[in-house]
Amino acid sequence: MTAVTPAQPPAAKRVLVVEDELMIRMLLEDMLAELGYTVAAEAGRIEEALQAAKTADFDLAILDVNLDGEPVLPVADALVARGMPFVFATGYGERGVPDPYRDRPMLKKPFQMEGLKQMLQTALEGEKN
């Protein structure tokens, strides 16, 4: 008898997770694993997130809009420069997303599995800016 492996996402497998709250980051990582994604890198501070955004090997990023009181805009800018798709995660709704990026997919906190799955698919299907 052979083991059945979970279905892998079709277009991307590796995710950069940028979230300052450790428990939320851990929950998100578990949810991503359940959906068949791998966390390629994680960051909880702007400096770490910028470094990962510029150098890590990943297919998609999830960005908390506020990292310990600092807006995540520089990280989003770095991802755009690399042509990488990303999703914002926020508990503030649309007003929490930086103005230049209001058209990006937004994942509302608290996370729900189906919402996460849909936002990742939306980001992957969209154009890489």
Regions found by a protein language model. Give the residues of each.
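Non-catalytic signal-transmission and effector/linker regions of two-component phosphorelay proteins
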Residues: 1-14, 112-129
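Conserved acidic carboxylate
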Residues: 19
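Two-component/phosphorelay signaling modules centered on CheY-like receiver
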Residues: 22-41
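Acidic, metal-coordinating helix/loop segments flanking the phosphotransfer/catalytic sites
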Residues: 42-60
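Active-site residues of response regulator receiver
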Residues: 64
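Acidic catalytic/metal-coordinating carboxylates
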Residues: 69-74
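Hydrophobic/aromatic residues positioned on beta-strands within the core alpha/beta folds
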Residues: 87-89
